[in-house]
Curated annotation (Swiss-Prot):
Belongs to the ZC3H14 family. The keyword Iron-sulfur does not apply. Residues 78-153, 308-351, 399-431 are annotated as: Disordered. InterPro entries: Nab2/ZC3H14 (IPR040366), Znf_CCCH (IPR000571). Expressed in hippocampal pyramidal neurons (at protein level). Expressed in kidney, liver, muscle, heart brain and testes. Expressed in hippocampal pyramidal neurons. RNA-binding protein involved in the biogenesis of circular RNAs (circRNAs), which are produced by back-splicing circularization of pre-mRNAs. Acts by binding to both exon-intron boundary and 3'-UTR of pre-mRNAs to promote circRNA biogenesis through dimerization and the association with the spliceosome. Required for spermatogenesis via involvement in circRNA biogenesis. Regulates the pre-mRNA processing of ATP5MC1; preventing its degradation. Also binds the poly(A) tail of mRNAs; controlling poly(A) length in neuronal cells. It comes from Mus musculus. GO terms for cellular component: axon cytoplasm; dendrite cytoplasm; nuclear speck; nucleolus; nucleus; ribonucleoprotein complex. This is Zinc finger CCCH domain-containing protein 14.
């Protein structure tokens, strides 16, 4: 950027800071408006008149301050550069006395065309030539400075000749005010005059042997080691026909030299301002300036643009300076592309820490491996292969020994040995297949014996029955004869593990209508009385119980045996020596509890059985309360009734801790019975006697508005006159 633009930006930032100090800063429009007035050289009175609407009582104070700053910029001193104090930032230039009125207010221009102001220094040996490019714009060196926090740190920029100036020469001394808020970088830029499209202010310095020095006090040099300090020194080259510029930026040196080799002209400074481009100016205040190096000997070179990042650190270059000198006939400059500036103000922008935190959390969620708990597999039993020896055949074989043992007739006893042999020969197959057996309930009902498996003789004499379940009786066992074979053990194991009473029924056998009965006795305490009828109780006391032929259950072995029971049963069958531990059987009997009925316990919450109660005790609260339609039969918890046992509401949805007394239904209001003769009360509808024995018809709820022609209720015949008939009108006098 040009030095004029930098000065204008500093003036604008100072104006903005002053407005904030006065409490009059609202947005960027007011500083831009003030800069336009400064560019148009408004007087103090005109500024006071124009700004009184915005600043109010602070208008005069602000305009006095602003014009004081502008007067300081116009002040001319004759002090030589060698006598200047190190704590002041001074920019010296040799100009004629008739054109020494250099104002920072002239830096900003409105979009309207304003003739450029050229301030030139004239010396006897001056030549009117300028450093320019042949085809494209060239920019001079951007010098970046960082100021210390110390109040005594200043930057002194001096343009001085190598010889003492003449007494007649005028010097422009630019000293910043304490409240100018000049704490940003100072950039020097030389731009191509041929490419100008805006009103500019050009400052031209002429000298035979000039040099530009940037001086910094030793204290600030020691304090700021990471700051890039630059000194631009200009001196003529041995060949006066061509020019060259050189800049080296080093972080460890106090000053570095860049060379400009054309003696007639030192530099050309241009500044433009337009309020319509303030977005670009704001962008300049955020971004660091583009940094370029260029050496112009007889030939030109391609120069890489150097730029600064936001944190002030300089990006490293890819190649050394010495390799940049080429033998090209033209100059190619690559301008730095400014970074995109967000349109929102900083106060409305998203916090960078929140964005970084969200990015880190997203990366953690992607990289983190979630350990999912293994889904427990269901206990499944392998199903026996579907062969001609089907499941019903295996089940019949399993109960064959049990059915043969309790024989009554002698022919059955003769066949008993044969059945035992058959059961023993097939015991291994039973043990192998029973652990994998899953019998469908329908197969139990429709079980038939296969003729391929049994011969006709065994079919005639063998008692083939299927297992059925009548009612859950936990303490009943089948008492069988002492001689038991493997088939009997199988049936007994099934009966003990299931905990239910197993009974059998005959298949349809036309040649044998009378089937032998299977005698069952009770071992231990009889079943609860509620589970059997009176006849069954009498049979239990006698020690015998008939077989219920008609109670056919739809439940098969799958309903009787759970997977755990089938596993234990298979282990017991595979253990013919009887070494199967009784502890496992005990654990099974303990684990096997009757399933609770899906009916709410009427004694809850005062039930004494606790968890052993077969009825349901609510645990979780009811979500439909108080609109629950189940009332006290709901399987979920309802709040307690505050009346408890005294509650007389039959359908009270609340919970009652103790049982309520039998709720007496409220007596219906006794309506007077109509008389037997049905005579209408003569005073109706004006009768006021509550126990009038005569008939009083019931009034229709719609009264005279009823539209049903067949309505059986009473409708008064005397109607109320219309509204207009009820209006009183004063009678007219007969005068």
């Amino acid at each position: 950027m040009e030095i004029g633009t930098e000065i204008s930006r500093k003036i604008r930032s100072a104006i903005k800071g002053k407005l904030q100090e006065l409490g009059a800063y609202v947005d960027e429009e007011l500083p831009d408006y003030i800069m336009v007035m400064v560019a148009n050289k408004k007087s103090q009175d005109q500024m006071t008149e124009d700004l009184s609407l915005f600043l109010g009582n602070n208008t005069i104070r602000f305009t006095v301050w602003l014009h004081g700053v502008l007067d300081k910029l116009r002040s001319v001193t004759t002090e030589p550069s060698s006598l200047k104090s190190p704590d002041a930032s001074i920019f010296d230039s040799h100009v004629p006395s008739n054109k020494s009125s250099f104002s920072r207010g002239d830096e900003r221009r409105h979009e309207a065309a304003v003739p450029p102001l050229a301030v030139s220094s004239s010396r006897p040996e001056k030549r009117d030539s300028r450093v320019s490019t042949s085809s494209q714009e060239q920019k001079s060196t951007n010098v970046r400075h960082s100021y210390d926090d110390g109040a005594s740190t200043r930057l002194m920029s001096t343009v001085k000749p190598l010889r003492e100036p003449a007494p007649s020469e005028d010097v422009i001394d630019i000293k910043p005010e304490p409240d100018d808020l000049i704490d940003e970088d100072l950039n020097f830029v030389q731009e191509n005059p041929l490419s100008q499209k805006k009103p500019t202010v050009t400052l031209t310095y002429g000298s035979s042997r000039p040099s530009i020095e940037i001086y910094r006090p030793p204290a600030s040099r020691n304090a700021d080691t990471g700051t890039h300090l630059n000194r631009l020194q200009l001196h003529p080259q041995q060949s006066s026909a061509h020019a060259a510029k050189q800049l080296d930026v080093q972080s460890s040196q106090v000053s570095e030299a860049g060379r400009l080799c054309e003696p007639p002209v030192l530099s050309s400074v241009e500044d433009t301002y337009s309020p319509f481009f303030r977005n670009n100016l704001d962008k300049m205040s955020i971004e660091d300036e583009n940094f370029r190096k260029r050496k112009l000997p007889v030939v030109s070179s391609v120069v890489k643009v150097k730029r600064f990042s936001h944190d002030g650190e300089e990006e490293e270059e890819d190649e050394d300076y010495g390799t940049r000198i080429g033998s090209l006939s033209s100059s190619v400059s690559v301008p730095a592309k400014p970074e995109r500036r967000p349109s929102l103000p900083p106060s409305k922008q998203a916090n960078k820490n929140l964005i970084l935190k969200a990015i880190s959390e997203a990366q953690e969620s992607v990289t983190k491996t979630t350990n999912y708990s293994a889904v427990p597999q269901k206990q499944t039993l392998p199903v026996a292969p579907r062969t001609r020896t089907s499941q019903e055949e295996l089940l019949a074989e399993m109960v064959q020994g049990q059915n043969r043992a309790p024989r009554i007739s002698p022919p059955v006893k003769e066949e008993e040995a044969k059945g035992d042999n058959t059961g023993k020969s097939q015991g291994t197959q039973q043990r192998q297949l029973l652990s994998r057996l899953q019998i469908d309930p329908v197969m139990v009902e429709t079980m038939e014996m296969s003729q391929d498996y049994y011969d006709m003789e065994s079919m005639v004499h063998a008692d083939t029955r299927s297992f059925i379940l009548k009612k859950p009786k936990l303490s009943e066992e089948i008492v069988v004869t002492p001689n038991q074979d493997s088939g009997m053990k199988t049936a007994d194991a099934l009966r003990v593990l299931s905990g239910h009473l197993m009974q059998t029924r005959d298949l349809v056998q036309p040649d044998k209508p009378a089937s032998p009965k299977f005698i069952v006795t009770l071992d231990g305490v009889p079943s609860p009385p509620g589970y059997m009828s009176d006849q069954e109780e009498e049979m239990c006391f006698e020690g015998m119980k008939p077989v219920n032929q008609t109670s056919a259950s739809n439940k098969g072995l799958r309903g009787l045996l759970h997977p755990q029971q089938l596993h234990l049963l298979s282990r017991q069958l595979e253990d013919p020596d009887g070494s199967f531990s009784n502890a496992e059987m005990t654990d099974l009997s303990v684990a096997q509890k009757p399933e609770k009925l899906l009916e709410r316990c009427k004694y809850w919450p005062a039930c004494k059985n606790g968890d052993e109660c077969v009825y349901h005790h609510p645990i979780s609260p009811c979500k439909a309360f108080p609109n629950c339609k189940f009332a006290e039969k709901c399987l979920f918890v309802h709040p307690n009734c505050k009346y408890d046992t005294k509650c007389t509401k039959a359908d009270c949805p609340f919970t009652h801790m103790s049982r309520r007394a039998s709720i007496l239904t409220p007596k219906p209001v006794s309506s007077p019975a109509p008389s037997s003769n049905g005579q209408l009360c003569r005073y109706f509808p004006a009768c006021k006697k509550m126990e009038c024995p005569f008939y009083h018809p019931k009034h229709c709820r719609f009264n005279t508005q009823c539209t049903r022609p067949d309505c059986t209720f009473y409708h008064p015949t005397i109607t109320v006159p219309p509204r207009h008939a009820l209006k009183w009108i004063r009678p007219q006098s007969s005068e």
